[in-house]
């Protein structure tokens, strides 16, 4: 008789209810959003405060490198700032999902905007990484020289700022997947 009961879909009484699993997913979603805020905001601040000045022959002639010398880095800072702002604004919805684990419409909205922010962050990080690669390696065919031999501090900071942004991309992928799993369980 027990086999017949299992065939009809009756499970054991120790199974976790769906609301509990969704609540756990919502708590993980909230924590991942906080970590992503730290990564993207840190990347924007690190890139936005990057500059280095080198003297050339005399103290009166100097070469400088700043993030806003290249529009790609400006786009990187703006995109990371927008994503950080969005994440801060999405925290109340994430808290709502912890309290009301069955909320479907707000999860759909979060999936939509999370995907849009993922695309923006990916575009900014990819464009900036191409410029960072050129700064490190140069391109002999285009007569672009590697500047990282002279501007070491500048290159270290712009390379480091990419880490938080690419970490944010990975976390956004996890956020979208978590929201989709939670939505499928509602």
From Swiss-Prot:
InterPro entries: CASP/CASPL, CASP_dom, CASPL. One of its GO terms (cellular component) is plasma membrane. It is found in: Cell membrane. Glycans are attached at residue 51. Its main location: membrane. The keyword Disulfide bond does not apply. It comes from the Eukaryota. Keywords: Cell membrane, Cell wall biogenesis/degradation, Glycoprotein, Membrane, Transmembrane, Transmembrane helix. The keyword Transmembrane applies. Belongs to the Casparian strip membrane proteins (CASP) family. Regulates membrane-cell wall junctions and localized cell wall deposition. Required for establishment of the Casparian strip membrane domain (CSD) and the subsequent formation of Casparian strips, a cell wall modification of the root endodermis that determines an apoplastic barrier between the intraorganismal apoplasm and the extraorganismal apoplasm and prevents lateral diffusion. This is Casparian strip membrane protein 3.
